[in-house]
């Protein structure tokens, strides 16, 4: 199956999801029309899946006018990489995969290097390398304002100065649906079509549109160890066990996905999208509770974004 053959769902969306979908389509089309060389960042998660699905709708029955980019740290869950490769083969989109080879040669990893250095080298620097290598002037991301406080104040069209630097005080006003896409050479934009969506909106949309997601989002018995106040999955042989530490099988799932040593699971019985929606109706805890990279230092997410992070 190729992109121009992708079936578009005809589900009856509720009014608020229709409004969010229309806004996202308008944003994606605006970037494609105004920027010279955009790219869509694909992290393999649920938000990326929704953003990609909406992009298909925006240009159906034509092909996507931009490639997808996955920054591969080499520490993603195996299920994520398998899902990525199968989806790319099925839909036939143009997928670029970039890894910071300098970081690999230096032996940077989540265990001995720590979350901060690993994230900076293998995610932030790798992303900037890929954007510069291909000359992309705009990058779509699946971030939402309800995820985290620094993202809550970021514009939909997030202006990045030369070197991909984000300065919150220099962001441009966004009045209604009017966006300023003008940039000088060396400058770029990060664009977030799902800014106004919530986690519940995303899962509700996935349910109605029947969008496939990585199986890690659903509860299953998995080998985990208790570290840093959360369950960490032992996904491959590279995981160094502490003295006396033994993986145990627990029925867990993930609300957010990243590098497996830095992503905590939650105990859950949710084995379907409908179960997840039911679970979310009662939860009062942020989905990013399991992201260890968000808790490594004060204001860490804003600091990372200023350095060029997603």
Swiss-Prot record:
GO terms for molecular function: ATP binding; sulfate adenylyltransferase (ATP) activity. Keywords: ATP-binding, Nucleotide-binding, Nucleotidyltransferase, Transferase. It catalyses: sulfate + ATP + H(+) = adenosine 5'-phosphosulfate + diphosphate. One of its GO terms (biological process) is hydrogen sulfide biosynthetic process. Pathway: Sulfur metabolism; hydrogen sulfide biosynthesis; sulfite from sulfate: step 1/3. SUPFAM superfamilies: Adenine nucleotide alpha hydrolases-like. The keyword Transit peptide does not apply. Heterodimer composed of CysD, the smaller subunit, and CysN. Belongs to the PAPS reductase family. CysD subfamily. With CysN forms the ATP sulfurylase (ATPS) that catalyzes the adenylation of sulfate producing adenosine 5'-phosphosulfate (APS) and diphosphate, the first enzymatic step in sulfur assimilation pathway. APS synthesis involves the formation of a high-energy phosphoric-sulfuric acid anhydride bond driven by GTP hydrolysis by CysN coupled to ATP hydrolysis by CysD. This is Sulfate adenylyltransferase subunit 2. The gene is cysD.
């Amino acid at each position: 199956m190729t992109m121009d053959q992708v079936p578009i769902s005809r589900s009856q969306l509720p009014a608020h999801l229709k409004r969010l979908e229309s806004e996202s389509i308008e944003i994606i089309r605006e970037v494609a029309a105004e920027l010279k060389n955009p790219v869509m960042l694909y992290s393999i998660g649920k938000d990326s899946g929704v953003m990609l699905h909406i992009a298909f709708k925006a240009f159906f029955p034509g092909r996507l006018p931009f490639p997808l980019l996955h920054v591969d740290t080499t520490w993603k869950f195996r299920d994520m990489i398998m899902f990525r490769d199968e989806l790319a083969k099925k839909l036939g989109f143009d997928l670029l995969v970039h890894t910071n080879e300098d970081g690999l040669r230096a032996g940077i990893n989540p265990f001995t290097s720590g979350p901060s250095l690993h994230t900076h080298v293998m995610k932030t620097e790798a992303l900037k390398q890929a954007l510069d290598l291909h000359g992309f002037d705009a990058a779509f991301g699946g971030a939402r304002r309800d995820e985290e406080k620094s993202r809550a104040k970021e514009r939909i069209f997030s202006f990045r100065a030369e070197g991909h630097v984000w300065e919150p005080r220099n962001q441009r006003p966004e009045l209604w649906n009017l966006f300023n896409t003008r940039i000088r050479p060396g400058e770029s934009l990060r664009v977030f079509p799902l800014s106004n969506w919530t986690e519940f909106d995303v899962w509700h949309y996935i349910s109605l549109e029947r969008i496939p997601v990585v199986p890690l989002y659903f509860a299953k018995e998995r080998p985990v160890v208790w570290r840093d106040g959360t369950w960490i999955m032992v996904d491959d042989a590279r995981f160094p066990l502490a003295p006396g530490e033994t993986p145990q099988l627990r029925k867990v799932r993930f609300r957010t996905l990243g590098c497996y040593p830095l992503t905590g699971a939650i105990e859950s019985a949710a084995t379907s999208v409908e179960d997840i929606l039911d679970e979310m109706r009662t939860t009062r805890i942020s989905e990013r509770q399991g992201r260890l990279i968000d808790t490594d230092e004060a204001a860490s997410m804003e600091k990372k974004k200023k350095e060029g992070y997603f």
